[in-house]
Amino acid sequence: MAFKKKDTENKEFYIVDKRILPKSIQNVIKVNDLILKTKMSKYSAIKKVGISRSTYYKYKDFIKPFYEGGEDRIYSLHLSLKDRVGILSDVLDVIAREKISILTVVQNMAVDGVAKSTILIKLSESMQKKVDKIISKIGKVEGIADIRITGSN
């Protein structure tokens, strides 16, 4: 669905794993990355990726990286943790080693051996670009059943 510039009430935003996006959208992301990272011209980047100009211009304004911002942002980490002593401490240690500010921590009682936990963190602009690596490190903690992240501002 295309949005008109004045259409702000009907916009809905989602965090979607890039792997499930259609190839045309993934290619627009590649073009944007080339332009941003290599200072390549739009024309050259479009040609290098091999998509049509119309496809690029149709979608380019609707695709932004998750970490794009320019200021500190607050994110919620939603964790499903296997019920074992010290697992939350292990997760917090990973966050501390990454020098990330923790704003709040909420942990619920374990049900069927799994505890839900939410950690509110504040990431600087430079850390936002590393969010995938941070989530990966947290996900490697023994006993993490699931991890999700959402932005809150």
UniProtKB/Swiss-Prot annotation:
SUPFAM superfamilies: ACT-like. Coiled coil: none annotated. InterPro entries: ACT-like_dom_sf (IPR045865), ACT_dom (IPR002912), UPF0735_ACT_dom-cont (IPR008310). Residues 76-152 form the ACT domain. It comes from the Bacteria. Pfam families: ACT_4. HAMAP family: UPF0735 (MF_00707). NCBIfam families: PRK04435.1 (NF003361). Belongs to the UPF0735 family. This is UPF0735 ACT domain-containing protein FN1487.
